[in-house]
């Protein structure tokens, strides 16, 4: 198992980060356009930039996945079709999806498109993954809170491609289930507008001194790569579409060495 080829999947919040990650050795890049992505406050990509990135990646034998990982309103589906069509024609390699309505819509409207179940779908076991497979998904991003044994079980039962976060920020809540930003700041994380209140300092139990009780340490699995491969993971995903281009290139280069 350890000799199998594993995809190194890097984030890109803008064109500079994209080219940096590609030349640092990423096998694939995931990014968002100017609509329907979970990082609405990233710089993101214009239509022309994104099409250019797809073509450039393909020249080098790399892949590009587009995030469509927010909840979409009924009134927005016609806009979603027009939004995706240029990328579909350019040969976009796959879309990462949260909303099952969006999933069904893209499956029917763009039949050649690869469909990936986002970590925002809260896939925590084999039954959720098997359901997605029956709906037409070829890849799933399990919830970040799963153990390696739970991930291994999903792989063994479903045979699907497994994409897992291996580096970057962690969520204190269940993947895809956090409403903290909506409640505290009126900005919905499930619409790509998370204010990240979990990263803020708070006072606890009447103590005047502020602390960070909800801000988790970032994930780093550089010392666990053999175990990750043995668990059947097919794609190593680096978190960080809100990070600087230097971060995307630097972290990608480090993991590429392994």
Q: Where do the PLM segments sit?
A:
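Hydrophobic alpha-helical bundles that form the membrane domains of multi-pass transporters
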Residues: 135-136, 241
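Conserved nucleotide-cofactor-binding alpha/beta core module
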Residues: 126-127
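Active-site pocket-lining/capping segments in soluble small-molecule metabolic enzymes
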Residues: 2-123, 141-145, 150-235, 244-258
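Extended, alpha-helix-rich binding/interface surfaces that flank or overlap catalytic cores
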Residues: 238
